[in-house]
Amino acid sequence: TDKALRMVISSYTREAGVRSLERQIGEICRKAARRIYEGNEKMIRVTGTNLEDFLGKPKYRPEKKNKKNEVGIVRGLAWTSVGGVTLEIEVNLMPGKGSVVLTGKLGDVMKESAQTGISYIRSISEDYHIDPEFFQKHDIHIHVPEGAVPKDGPSAGITMATAILSAVTGKPVRADVAMTGEITLRGRVLPIGGLKEKLLAAKNAGMKTVCIPKENEQDLAEISEEIVGDMEIIPVEHMDQVIKAAFV
């Protein structure tokens, strides 16, 4: 059925192409043919209910947006060898001496993006009535779940900066907003790669709004309306625009 096919795509494959999908469909056909040959059944109908009988337990968990707006949690978008994925960034604050903890198997470039985001938020702290001594009196822990999976690249810069500002101010971020873009020390948003794959991941996760770099706006012409769908795409040049779109 159509539902079973969608479940195969979302729960049993994770790739940029269709090779793995072809293998999974082949496995279903072989097991169905064996049942018919052995005389157990005359016709096989594969549905969402009996799919596990053919492919076993799902290998992947479909990505879905959070159910409620939360403080210090923002959904980013990443481009991997198997296509686009959503990337949840979590920030927690603890009394301390201003140290920064980064976990989630992050690469050097991503760690540098986190430091850039922190520096930018510190530079605008007066605009948000943040105590100048706040960052000297608190430790910042930035975590990207699925810690066994390596993550790198600069495109989560605006996501981490948004999560940090949310945690520091206590203001929640919309659960239906995703974003991608590199950040500079001045808060400018720089272009990224893999926009098509990232937007597809956002659509599959149920996101309603996606912030992308203004310099990537021209790439939208090459992306089908089927992928963009009903999502609101907001091209941004500066973090001010990201914050306006993301905060509740």
Per-range role (PLM):
Residues T1-T13:
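Short conserved motifs of the RecA-like P-loop NTPase core
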Residues I9-S10, R19-E38:
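C-terminal helical "lid" of AAA+/P-loop NTPase domains
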Residues I36, N40-E63:
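Amphipathic alpha-helical
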Residues M43, R61-K65, E70-R75, G83-V248:
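Peripheral, non-AAA+ core regions of ATP-driven protein-machinery
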Residues G48-E52, G76, I89:
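C-terminal accessory/connector segments of nucleic-acid motor ATPases
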